């Protein structure tokens, strides 16, 4: 019996039947048509849906298993990287041992691009690609669920309550242990929801959940058996910086953020097509946990993620601007801004970006960029 059937990604023999099914899904074809041909779809919806269907069928006609669909996705990634980044670099890949599989826990800045960039690095380095944890809050439509599970994503049920939630989390944890034991790499974000303020913190509750799959072991031993490697994704420019600042401003001024059905989709699309500049993916060191305190273990992961964060001029310019208006913390050690040589080109680029944003959002946007510098200084990783 396949007890993971309802949450796991689709397997080789399921790929083609699922593809053939969603290629007939009118709602999906409408979404694809609006993405590729927004203006024409408004005036000629049926014609453009047929055009989208033809385009998709051509792209996936040779897809028959997981590997062939990942090859198609790699082509999309290549184009996205070419269009939205200036550089894509990595560090620490040499630490990954051949024949060993890992649970990668990364900071969370972008809904889909975080795991996509980690996956891209592994794919091109010849490592096994990721099984990706994705929350059911993003899977509002059946065709979206299908698309995610076609691309090696497994489902995290966040909308359940009480006993159902507990059983679901145990199954999820068992699945991740099963993956690592059976030579699959896994990715999960360090927290539920993206870091809107540029502060990357691991949720201790996540670590408790990860340990549930091996109740025969102590918490630290269970986590150690997952071969956990912290990963840091650094974006020179956050494609969703304005959207995040708007959310934080609304929480500050109104007490809460009103999310619509389109909020996540808007963030996903903006994250994919928005300008990112230099993106760096840093693979940390595999962790062996000697403690069973989830708060202490979360701090160990956080320290690696922060230390490996690659700072860009955008981070220092943001801190400089906050300092000029008296908003930067007064207890920052050293005078790191005096020693950072910032290019005129990067200054102009940042100025242009911030001028396009409503002034009421500037403070939140600037802290989103400045906080990695501030936290590195406070933690002694930057002197």
Model-derived segments and their meaning:
Residues 149-152, 181-184, 192:
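Eukaryotic endomembrane system proteins
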Residues 159-166, 194-200:
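Flexible, glycine/proline-enriched loop segments at strand-loop-helix junctions
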Residues 189:
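Acidic beta-strand-to-loop metal/phosphate-binding motif
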Residues 131, 135-159, 166:
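Conserved nucleotide-cofactor-binding alpha/beta core module
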Residues 1-102, 108-131, 136-142, 170-186, ...:
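Membrane-interfacial terminal anchoring regions of lipid-handling membrane enzymes
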């Amino acid at each position: 019996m396949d007890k993971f059937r309802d949450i796991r990604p689709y397997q080789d023999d399921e790929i083609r039947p699922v593809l053939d099914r969603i290629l007939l899904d009118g709602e999906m074809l409408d979404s694809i048509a609006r993405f590729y041909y927004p203006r024409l779809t408004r005036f000629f919806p049926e014609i453009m849906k047929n055009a989208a269907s033809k385009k998709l069928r051509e792209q996936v006609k040779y897809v028959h298993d997981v590997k062939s669909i990942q090859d198609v996705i790699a082509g999309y990634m290549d184009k996205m990287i070419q269009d939205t980044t200036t550089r894509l670099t990595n560090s620490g890949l040499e630490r990954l041992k051949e024949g060993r599989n890992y649970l990668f826990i990364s900071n969370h800045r972008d809904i889909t691009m975080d795991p996509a960039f980690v996956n891209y690095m592994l794919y091109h380095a010849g490592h096994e690609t990721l099984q990706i944890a994705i929350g059911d809050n993003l899977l509002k439509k059946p065709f979206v669920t299908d698309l995610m599970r076609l691309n090696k994503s497994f489902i995290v049920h966040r909308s359940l309550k009480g006993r159902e939630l507990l059983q679901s989390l145990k199954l999820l944890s068992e699945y991740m242990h099963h993956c690592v034991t059976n030579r699959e790499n896994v990715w999960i974000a360090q927290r539920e929801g993206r870091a809107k303020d540029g502060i990357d913190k691991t949720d201790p509750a996540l670590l408790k959940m990860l340990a549930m799959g091996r109740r025969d072991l102590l918490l630290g031993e269970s986590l150690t058996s997952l071969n956990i490697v912290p990963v840091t994704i650094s974006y020179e420019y956050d494609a969703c910086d304005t959207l995040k600042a708007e959310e934080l401003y609304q929480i500050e001024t109104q007490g809460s953020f009103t999310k619509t059905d389109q909020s996540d989709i808007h963030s996903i699309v903006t994250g994919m097509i928005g300008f990112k500049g230099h993106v760096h993916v840093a693979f940390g060191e595999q962790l062996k946990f000697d403690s069973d305190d989830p708060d202490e273990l979360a701090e160990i992961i956080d320290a690696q993620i922060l230390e490996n964060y690659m700072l860009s001029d955008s981070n220092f310019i943001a801190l400089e601007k906050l300092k000029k208006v008296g908003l930067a913390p007064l207890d920052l050690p050293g005078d790191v801004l005096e020693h950072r040589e910032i290019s005129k080109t990067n200054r102009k680029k940042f100025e242009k970006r911030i001028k396009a944003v409503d002034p009421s959002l500037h403070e939140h946007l600037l802290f989103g960029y400045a906080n990695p510098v501030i936290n590195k200084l406070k933690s002694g990783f930057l002197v």
